[in-house]
Amino acid sequence: MSSPSHTADTPITGRNQLVDYLAPGGKPKADWRIGTEHEKFGFRLDDLRPPTFDGDRGIEALLEGLVRFGWTPVRESVDGNPPRTIALVRDGASVTLEPAGQLELSGAALEDIHQTCVETGT
């Protein structure tokens, strides 16, 4: 969620005032795009617990396994430790690790819903 804006202390009192405020953020219809986001929680089949980040059944191993499908790993090193895979990117889309351990696919900005369907199926 965005932080509240402190650009104006005067309340908007009319439709035209609101339109004038919002219009600069608009885009021509030819530039309109849509994108999808999907969040998925993982669970281990044997005990239904969430996966850890480490290990051969962990989240990092899952991300590394997706590299063979054309995803590029995003790696981060903390405090001089070896880099760890924390996300993936491909064609304007990304797979990221969310705070509760779920994975999020953020789709690319596409022209129509049919393109988003193709994106989620590949």
Role assignments for model-derived ranges:
Residues 1-122:
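Terminal catalytic/cofactor-binding subdomain
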